[in-house]
């Protein structure tokens, strides 16, 4: 999907859940530096599973995932994961620190940023997402839209090279959705977004992978996929 450095490669990847149900089947794709890829499909097509596989958070049942040319193992897992930011569909799966400020600083503290660097970053991203007034509040007391903004801010703050997003605009109001999309449009790294919202996919991506309800790739290509109603209907998207 490009001429630059290959960032993520999936080679005939399948994943089965412990109960035997299929996550994805025989998925192969290549994502290059600077790519903006939309994983589109109906609910249950395997988009979320594929995001977790591409992030190295699940291990394939079959096939291989390579990130920056390497399979993840105990020796390189921390190094690789610091280059990748993952935004989960449900912020409650991610937010666990006592305050919003602590959420924003969780990774910077692990990376041993200076106090000045951390304070400057908190100020920048809190203002960017409109959450300055929430910095001292516990995340569990926030609304769904506020939680989503905190989650995305806490990933972007450490400037990952690759951003993997699972339904980043789900369950938010129109104003919050527009803010999130504007910020993600400005992200300069490699971006992969899983979504069933075609307008979101079209706004953030220029290359697309369509997953069908058999958990396989139905098609891959450019924005012409979004205009092919027959193909989208076959995959259960419309």
UniProtKB/Swiss-Prot annotation:
UniProt membrane topology term: Peripheral membrane protein
Record-linked Pfam families: ABC_tran (PF00005)
Name of the molecule in the record: Putative ABC transporter ATP-binding protein AF_1841
Cellular compartment(s): Cell membrane
Keywords attached to this entry: ATP-binding, Cell membrane, Membrane, Nucleotide-binding, Translocase, Transport
An annotated GO cellular component: ATP-binding cassette (ABC) transporter complex
Lineage top rank: taxon: Archaea
Family: Belongs to the ABC transporter superfamily.
EC number, UniProt record: 7.-.-.-
InterPro entries recorded: AAA+_ATPase (IPR003593), ABC_transporter-like_ATP-bd (IPR003439), ABC_transporter-like_CS (IPR017871), ABC_transpr_CbiO/EcfA_su (IPR015856), ECF_ABC_transporter_ATP-bd (IPR050095), P-loop_NTPase (IPR027417)
Function: Probably part of an ABC transporter complex. Responsible for energy coupling to the transport system.
SUPFAM superfamilies cross-referenced by the UniProt entry: P-loop containing nucleoside triphosphate hydrolases (SSF52540)
Domain annotation ABC transporter: ranges: 8-238
Keyword match ATP-binding: yes
UniProt-annotated binding residues for ATP: 41-48
Keyword RNA-binding listed: no
A GO MF label: ATP hydrolysis activity
């Amino acid at each position: 999907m490009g001429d630059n450095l290959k960032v993520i490669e999936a080679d005939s990847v399948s994943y089965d859940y412990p109960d035997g149900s299929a996550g994805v089947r025989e998925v192969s794709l290549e994502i290059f530096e600077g790519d903006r890829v939309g994983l589109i499909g109906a609910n249950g097509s395997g988009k979320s599973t594929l995001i977790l596989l591409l992030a190295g958070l699940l291990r394939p049942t079959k096939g291989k995932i390579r990130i920056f040319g390497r399979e993840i193992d105990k020796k390189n897992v921390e190094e690789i994961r610091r280059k990748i930011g993952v935004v989960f569909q449900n912020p409650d799966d991610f937010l666990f620190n006592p305050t919003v400020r602590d959420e924003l600083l969780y990774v910077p503290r692990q990376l041993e940023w200076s106090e000045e660097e951390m304070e400057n970053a908190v100020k920048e991203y809190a203002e960017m997402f409109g959450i300055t007034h929430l910095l001292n509040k516990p995340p569990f007391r926030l609304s769904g839209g506020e939680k989503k903004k905190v989650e995305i801010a806490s990933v972007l703050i450490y400037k990952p090279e690759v951003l993997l997003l699972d339904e980043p605009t789900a369950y938010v109001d129109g104003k919050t959705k527009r803010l999130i999309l504007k910020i993600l449009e400005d992200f300069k790294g490699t971006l992969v977004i899983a979504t069933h919202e075609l307008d979101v996919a079209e706004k953030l991506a220029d290359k697309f992978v369509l997953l069908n309800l058999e958990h396989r790739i139905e098609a891959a290509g450019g924005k012409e996929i979004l205009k092919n109603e027959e193909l989208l209907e076959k995959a259960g998207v419309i």
